[in-house]
A protein has these predicted regions:
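Helix-adjacent hinge/juxtasegments
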Residues: 55-104
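Conserved P-loop
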Residues: 2-72
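Residue-level signal for inorganic ion chemistry
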Residues: 17, 48, 79, 127, ...
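Short, glycine/serine-rich, charged loops/turns that create anion-binding
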Residues: 10, 35, 84, 129-130, ...
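Residues at the starts of beta-strands that form the adenosine-phosphate
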Residues: 26-29, 76, 121, 160
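Structural motif
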Residues: 4, 77-79, 123-125
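Generic detector of well-ordered alpha-helical packing
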Residues: 14, 62, 82-83, 128, ...
């Protein structure tokens, strides 16, 4: 089963995705997409690793590409948290330059498909974006458009789409109506 879990900031989407993934298989891989770019990020990563270890997840750090996680596939479940970080890391280089969004989209769609085929189950956490209107910086608007397009492409090919609102999972596609 392949499931996309989306929600706004603080909606509970990650906690729901972790519970879902833990229920699907005893072999659990957690793909972390946050870039380690300083002491604060390093501490957050350390804390998250510790929390996930208690749930039986093996963590694979993939801030720029999902392909490294494909090598560990097979039986079991993979949880990617989250697509927003992955898109930002792929779109914006550390020096601030921006990649071609169309190229980034196609690359990430290909990586998601490869990951979904590498594991028995895949759970991806995406960000619900775009409802806030437009942003002052065009680069932020480009990120919003790209994450929205990626969510749509994943939703079209995955078995299940769940939107988490205030901690409540709402099945949009597949699953329980």
């Amino acid at each position: 089963m392949r499931t996309l879990v989306v929600g706004g900031s603080g909606s509970g989407k990650s906690a729901y995705a972790e519970r879902l993934a833990a229920s699907l298989a005893p072999r659990r891989t957690y793909v972390a997409t946050m870039r380690n770019d300083g002491a604060e990020a390093a501490e957050r990563i350390r804390r998250h690793r510790s929390q996930r270890a208690e749930l039986g997840f093996i963590t694979v750090e993939c801030p720029d590409s999902l392909m490294a996680a494909c090598q560990d596939g097979g039986s079991g479940v993979v949880l990617v948290d989250d697509l927003g970080n992955l898109v930002a890391n792929a779109l914006f280089a550390p020096d601030g330059t921006m990649a071609d969004p169309a190229v980034v989209l196609e690359r990430l769609v290909g990586e998601v498909e490869a990951l979904g085929q590498s594991y028995e189950h895949a759970v991806l956490v995406g960000n619900e974006v775009g409802g806030e209107g437009t942003y002052r910086l065009e680069s932020t608007n480009e990120w919003v458009r790209l994450i929205g397009a990626l969510n749509c492409r994943i939703a079209a090919s995955f078995d299940e789409v769940v939107e988490v609102v205030a901690g409540v999972p709402c099945h949009v596609k597949g699953g329980v109506a």
